[in-house]
């Protein structure tokens, strides 16, 4: 287009096939085949009114269809339309962004009553302020509303889906700081630290937890959930000698996610299922002439596997280490990347979800071609 007007168009088609078979004679035998199709198109346009002021508009359309070979299946079809208008202002040390997203969702079924059509407008406002000229330090804040429709998996998978699920509405408040510094040809090349505190109010939060079989989960809405949390992350890069760069990242999250639906419930103000209070990760990467060596450590703290925070529902923390080595080769037709991964390096026993043991030490090799 030109320097003032820019546009982008995307399109996607996807097909998913899920075949679930359970021949355990102690349980109900199941042999279900699900097929899903998705078509997605979007266009985004941005116009620069002044060097300090941009406006944009985007339009998205998505079509989803689900079929299954079960008696009485409803064969749902969903039409989703998204229309967004946004603006961004840069006024000296202040950056201000605002947007409004209109969402229209229409579900149709071949059997039973038609689901209710949904129309919702969700605004967002973002603000950042950089108080110092000589230091890359900024304060940021945002207010945002979001809306999430239950997926077809949430609604219609047999003995898992809940066709009565309501959409999830979230109101988010966030305050944060960011500081970063760049150095030239020195040992330390880059350092960044950021911290955010947030409060989310969630109406009809959609959660899932297993009934005891791998494919069968309970889907339900929690009427009112309040989430308070802190995210802290740091990143640094060093260059000990020519062509060798070492990057280290550390991230920590504290999250208190409580169910405030009904004061008469035994689990009123309890932490909601499978949300840990503490979690974090550490990543180290060494890069040298196209070779990359990566190590990652993930920690998930204690949590509960049901709505009541009692000893019987307590779930132990878990942590794991992974390592990978990759090499990128430049070819005439593009590039070729070969990688080898060792996951769960210490071969530990752990469950992300109760009674769903994760693999012990395992290996994966891959080749990726880019044209």
Residue ranges and their predicted role:
Residues 2-6, 48-54, 92-94, 131-137, ...:
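Short loop/turn motifs that connect adjacent beta-strands in outer-membrane beta-barrel proteins
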Residues 4, 8-20, 132, 138-144, ...:
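Membrane-embedded beta-barrel scaffold of Gram-negative outer-membrane proteins
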Residues 203, 299-306, 315-316, 322-371:
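C-terminal beta-signal and adjacent terminal beta-strands/loops
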């Amino acid at each position: 287009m030109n320097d003032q007007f820019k546009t982008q168009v995307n399109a996607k088609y996807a097909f998913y096939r899920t075949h679930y078979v359970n021949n355990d004679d102690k349980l109900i035998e199941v042999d279900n085949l699900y097929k899903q199709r998705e078509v997605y198109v979007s266009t985004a346009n941005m116009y620069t009114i002044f060097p300090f002021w941009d406006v944009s508009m985007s339009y998205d359309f998505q079509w989803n269809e689900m079929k299954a070979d079960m008696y009485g299946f409803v064969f749902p079809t969903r039409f989703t339309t998204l229309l967004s208008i946004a603006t961004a202002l840069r006024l000296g040390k202040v950056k201000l962004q605002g947007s409004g997203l209109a969402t229209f969702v229409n579900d149709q079924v071949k059997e039973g009553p038609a689901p209710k059509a949904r129309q919702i407008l969700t605004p967002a406002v973002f603000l950042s302020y950089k108080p110092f000229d000589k230091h890359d330090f900024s304060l940021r804040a945002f207010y945002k509303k979001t809306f999430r429709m239950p997926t077809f998996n949430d609604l219609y998978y047999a003995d898992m889906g809940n066709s009565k699920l309501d959409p999830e509405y979230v109101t988010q408040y966030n305050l944060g700081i960011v500081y970063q510094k760049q150095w030239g040809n020195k040992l330390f090349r880059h350092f960044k630290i950021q911290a955010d505190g947030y409060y989310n109010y969630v109406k009809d939060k959609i959660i899932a937890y297993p009934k005891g079989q791998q494919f069968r989960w309970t889907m339900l809405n929690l009427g009112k959930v309040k989430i308070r949390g802190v995210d802290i992350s740091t990143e640094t890069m060093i260059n000990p000698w020519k062509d060798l760069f070492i990057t280290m990242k550390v991230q920590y999250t504290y999250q208190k996610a409580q169910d405030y639906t009904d004061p008469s419930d035994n689990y009123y103000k309890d932490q909601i299922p499978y949300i840990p209070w503490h979690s974090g990760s550490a990543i180290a990467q060494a890069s040298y002439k196209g070779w990359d060596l990566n190590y990652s450590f993930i920690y998930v703290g204690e949590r509960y596997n049901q709505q009541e925070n009692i000893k019987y529902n307590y779930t132990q923390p878990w942590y794991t280490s992974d390592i990978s080595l990759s090499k990128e080769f430049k070819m005439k037709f593009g590039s070729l990347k070969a990688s080898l991964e060792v996951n769960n390096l210490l071969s530990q026993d752990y469950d992300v979800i109760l009674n769903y043991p994760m693999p012990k030490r395992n290996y994966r090799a891959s080749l990726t071609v880019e044209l």
